């Protein structure tokens, strides 16, 4: 296959890591369909492995210069699916408030929609540093809420909820920041007319 074909480089290391993250998602969901320490521990382990692939795929994509269109699409999709589906599965276990899940998922859908509209107009809205911090807090929160129980005198449910409240604040703050950027960018042409 020629290097300049649309499919060139699809089977690179970063994309393979992203696919591995997608493969972890059903394991997390199946584990969380059961209550108890061991299913929660397994869910946390798989979620943690998936989160590590998220760090590594970005690192290798930049280092190897192997950023692909597929990777740009799949990486954020895998992130959103992992976190959103994990949060949804934690609801029946009474480990996370429903309204928090609704707020976070609604924000993700709204921002994804805004970015799609911007891209269709040839405009790139830069990722906010707040969004990166939000993602980190969400990941730690999900790990804590999956573990849920007390280990080594640490109540992981409390740890998870503490990080979740921080993630919620950054979710709303970064969401407002995206809407502000979107409004500024799309109001410029109107002012020039």
List where the protein language model places each region.
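Interfacial helix-loop-helix junctions of multi-pass membrane proteins
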Residues: 67, 121-123
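Nucleotide and nucleotide-moiety/phosphate-recognizing core
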Residues: 28
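A generic "structured core" feature
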Residues: 47-52, 59, 63
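C-terminal membrane-associated helical module and adjoining short loops/tails
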Residues: 1-14, 19, 24-25, 35, ...
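Multi-pass membrane catalytic core of lipid/isoprenoid biosynthesis enzymes
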Residues: 17, 22, 46, 63-115, ...
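Membrane-spanning helices that line or support transport/gating and their immediate boundary helices
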Residues: 55, 59, 112-120, 178-186
